[in-house]
Structure formats: C-alpha cells, structure tokens
Amino acid sequence: MRVALVFLVLSILAATHGDTNLDMERKEADESSLSEMKEMLLLQELQAVEAALFGKMNVENDENRDFREKRCGGYGMSCKSVQDCCGELDCRKDPSTWIDHPYCLNPKKG
C-alpha cells in the first residue's frame, strides 16, 4: 500500500511539474512571437518614416532639377549688377571704350 501511495504521489508531482514546463515553454513561445511582431511593427514604422523623409528629399530634388546655380561673370564679361561679377570685381562702365554696357572690371583703387 505504501508503495502504491508513493507511486501515486510521484505521478501527481510529475504531471504537475511537467505541465509547468509546458506552460513555461508556451509562454516563452508567445513572448517571442509578440516580440517578433513588435519588431516587425517597428520596422514598418521606420520604413514609413524613411520613405516620408526621402520622398520629401526626392520631391525637392525633382522641383529643382532644372535649376542651375547662377554663375558669376569674370573679368571683361558684361553684367547688370555687382552680384553678376565674381569675387571682388565691380560692375561698371569702362570709360575708355565707346560701348555703353557695363562690364566686370577690377575695383577702382583709392
């Protein structure tokens, strides 16, 4: 009778202990699947943000793709204002010529 009682207690303990291991494995599997789902959601959010940022950059580049930076005029080039001339050149009429158009010339000294 004692032997049967011992086996009964051992079988009950084994069954309850085995169930806890299975429950723990199920919890770990659920947690890992949840963490994978969270990672996938985070990845999708990051991809959406990246697409939005790079999309804006591409739109700006598309808008300005035909725009070319204005070049400055060198010495002796015709100009309309000082901003048209490179560096420290002045946009002024050359008194030594009969042409009325201003040119990029060296600044007056003094």
Swiss-Prot record:
Its main location: secreted. It is found in: Secreted. Residues 1-18 form the signal peptide. One of its GO terms (cellular component) is extracellular region. It comes from the Eukaryota. Disulfide bonds join 72-86, 79-91, 85-104. Expressed by the venom gland. The presence of a 'disulfide through disulfide knot' structurally defines this protein as a knottin. Probable ion channel inhibitor. This is U12-hexatoxin-Hi1a. The lineage of its organism: Eukaryota, Metazoa, Ecdysozoa, Arthropoda, Chelicerata.
